């Protein structure tokens, strides 16, 4: 069986696609797996804020188009970049085991930043929460791949940049992490640290294959967080975060807890339920 995996062309996206390819080969050594790297508008236009070109959804749209028109069989995304609603004809067929959900600083620890220091981030969610924690800081926009972001932290006009900790772990750059922020302090982006593996909804054979790399607890947490985002009527650009965890009392039932900040001030919500509908 041949499986073509569509992904963005960035080093992190390629790592993620190669990781899923490895999981599939482990599940079925006879598979012929090919990674198809695509350039997306979000990757090409790093000179403008994401909000001006359609938000984080621009990273997913062109990769999803490759699925819908038959150029690829599977798409691998950072789950945090996906809008809350999946396009008609596609399905998130697998969520592999999730990585680190936390945000992190490169360049300086949060508590050590002096008043009026500059923190670079392209995320409204991160900016809102950091401004709530440290209203004395200043913020600048940040775009580009991880190498660009790390380089930005070394410039004289920026004192720290905010990244997803998991990205540096996956790229072998964990030694550049200066301050990893607990999820209780800095609520992560919905589905941060998770991968979403999409395929066409009518491809029964491929859906069965992808079910073999599913991680049940990660899926339940990601589904709960995405349901939270959907209820807010937002997409992945909404300045709201959520972190769901499977409570140890009854793992099979999938109870979870979540919290989320929103941009008009910071509103934090903690809740518990037995499924995404309760969240």
Task: Give names to the regions the model predicted.
Residues 72-76, 118, 159-160:
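Short, Asp-centered acidic motifs that coordinate Mg2+ and/or phosphate
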Residues 4-6, 75, 93, 120, ...:
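Short, well-ordered beta-strand segments
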Residues 79-82, 88-137:
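A conserved helix-loop-strand patch within extracytoplasmic ligand-binding domains
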Residues 1-39, 45-48, 52, 136-279:
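Small-molecule-sensing regulatory modules
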Residues 47-74:
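Short, structured active-site "lid" loops
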């Amino acid at each position: 069986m041949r499986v073509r995996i569509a992904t963005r062309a960035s080093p992190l996206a390629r790592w993620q696609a190669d990781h899923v390819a490895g999981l599939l080969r482990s599940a079925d050594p006879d598979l012929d797996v090919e990674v198809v790297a695509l350039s997306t508008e979000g990757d090409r236009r790093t000179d403008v804020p994401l909000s001006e070109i359609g938000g984080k959804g621009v990273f997913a749209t062109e990769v999803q188009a490759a699925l819908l028109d038959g150029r690829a069989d599977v798409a691998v995304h950072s789950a945090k970049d996906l809008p809350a609603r999946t396009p008609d004809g596609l399905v998130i067929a697998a969520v592999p085991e999730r990585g680190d959900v936390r945000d992190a600083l490169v360049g300086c620890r949060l508590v050590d930043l002096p008043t009026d220091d500059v923190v670079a981030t392209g995320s409204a969610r991160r900016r809102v929460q950091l401004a709530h924690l440290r209203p004395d800081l200043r913020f600048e926009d940040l775009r580009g791949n991880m190498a660009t972001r790390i380089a930005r932290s070394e410039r004289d006009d920026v004192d720290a940049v905010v990244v997803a900790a998991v990205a540096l772990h996956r790229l072998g750059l964990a030694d550049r992490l200066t301050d990893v922020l607990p999820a209780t302090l800095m609520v992560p982006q919905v589905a941060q640290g998770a991968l979403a593996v999409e395929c066409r909804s009518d491809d029964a054979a491929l859906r069965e294959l992808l079910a073999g790399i599913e991680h049940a607890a990660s899926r339940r947490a990601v589904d709960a967080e995405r349901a939270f985002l959907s209820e807010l009527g937002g997409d992945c650009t909404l300045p709201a975060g959520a972190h769901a965890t499977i409570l140890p009392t009854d793992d099979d039932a999938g109870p979870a807890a979540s919290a989320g900040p929103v941009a008009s001030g910071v509103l934090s919500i903690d809740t518990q339920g037995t499924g995404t509908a309760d969240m």
